[in-house]
Structures are given as C-alpha cells and as structure tokens.
Swiss-Prot record:
Residues 81-176 form the Toprim domain. Belongs to the RecR family. The gene is recR. One of its GO terms (biological process) is DNA repair. This is Recombination protein RecR. Gene3D superfamilies: 3.30.60.80, 3.40.1360.10, 6.10.250.240, RecR Domain 1. May play a role in DNA repair. It seems to be involved in an RecBC-independent recombinational process of DNA repair. It may act with RecF and RecO. Keywords: DNA damage, DNA recombination, DNA repair, Metal-binding, Zinc, Zinc-finger.
C-alpha cells in the first residue's frame, strides 16, 4: 500500500536510485526537499541539470571537467613526466587532498571485473596507451583500489607497460584491502604514494 501521493512517491523512488541511499534515507531527503522554499528547491534542481549538461570528460586524462581540458592537465606547473592512473574521478580529489602528487592523472572510470562483465575494453586503458605513445612519460603510478578488481587492473596495465620501458610503480598499501581511495585520509594516501613500489 502506498501512503504517499504520486509526486512524493516518485521523488522517493528517484532518490532511492542513488548509490548508498536506502528507502528510509530517500524518504527523509524527499520530505526535506518538499519542506524547502521553492527558490531553494529550484536552485537544487537547476544545479543538477547544469552539472549534467556541462560536465564532460577531459580530452587528455578523462577526468570530469566543464572544459575541453581539465585544470590539472592545463596547469603548466604539473609534472607531465609522471602519470597516476586511478579508477574514478573521486580518486583524483582524494589524491589532490594529499598535496603530495605533482604529476598528472589518467582516470580509467572503472576496474577490470570479469564477474561483472567489465574487461579491459570497458575502461579507459586504450586511451592511456594512446596517450603514452603520443606523449611518453618517465613513470606511471598505478593507484587502483586495494581490492581484487584493483589488483587485477594494476597487474594488467603493468604487463602492458613493462615492455615499453616505462617505470611502473604501485602505491603502497597503507590503504586497507577492500577499501576505496576516496575514503582514505590525506596522511594515509601521502604515505601510500611515498611508499609506492616498482612492478
């Protein structure tokens, strides 16, 4: 039995589609939005639409940006000789919080996961290889999450890059196995970056 009017039920359904949002949280969010002033609700709705319309992938690193080239790739002070390969745009934010890494990034937008039907072709590995052919670098740091998918992805990329003669390293495991970079604190990430090992 549905206790809500159709617009409220629809709003709850939409919120519950978001990752990590269960039915109860979706209900709380829906009621919060309804209790907001009309102007605030409109700002929220417009900012979602604006982000959806204007955000695209950087043509160099595939990070999210509202420009053709993101702020990191266009920064002349960043080391272009070192690329840190990560799974997700949120990991760029996590790494940047450390203020330790001064190179550039390459965002895969996923990790190899045969059980979920995600192979190397479904993530941005091909784009990484093309980038390295066009602009050779001294080192590639593999900063995948320390879980089975992250390890498989790091090993796969490492095997592809070793014959090219590029130094390939993996961040150290100060990060718990099964954890996500996004949730690691700055000190842990800094130490993991410092303690990276060649593979």
């Amino acid at each position: 039995m549905n206790y809500y009017s159709a617009p409220i039920a629809k709003l709850i359904d939409e919120f519950s589609k978001l990752p990590g949002i269960g039915r109860k949280t979706a209900q709380r969010l829906a009621f919060h939005v309804i209790s907001m002033g009309y102007e605030d609700a409109e700002k929220l709705s417009n900012s979602i639409i604006e982000a959806k319309k204007s955000i695209k992938y950087c043509r160099i690193c595939t990070n999210l940006t509202d420009k053709e080239v993101c702020n990191i790739c266009s920064d002349p002070n960043r080391k272009k000789s070192v690329i840190c390969v990560i799974e997700d745009p949120r990991d760029v934010v996590a790494m940047e919080r450390t203020r330790e890494f001064k190179g550039q990034y390459h965002v895969l937008h996923g990790a190899i996961s045969p059980l979920e039907g995600i192979g190397p072709e479904e993530i941005n590995i091909k784009e990484l290889l093309i980038r390295l052919q066009e602009h050779p670098v001294e080192e590639v740091i593999l900063a995948m999450n320390p879980n089975i998918e992250g390890e498989a992805t790091a090993m796969y990329i490492g095997k592809l890059l070793k014959p090219i003669g590029i130094k390939v390293s993996r961040i150290a495991h100060g990060i718990p196995v099964g954890g996500d970079l996004e949730y690691a604190d700055e000190v842990t990430l800094s130490k993991a970056l410092e303690g990276r090992r060649e593979i």
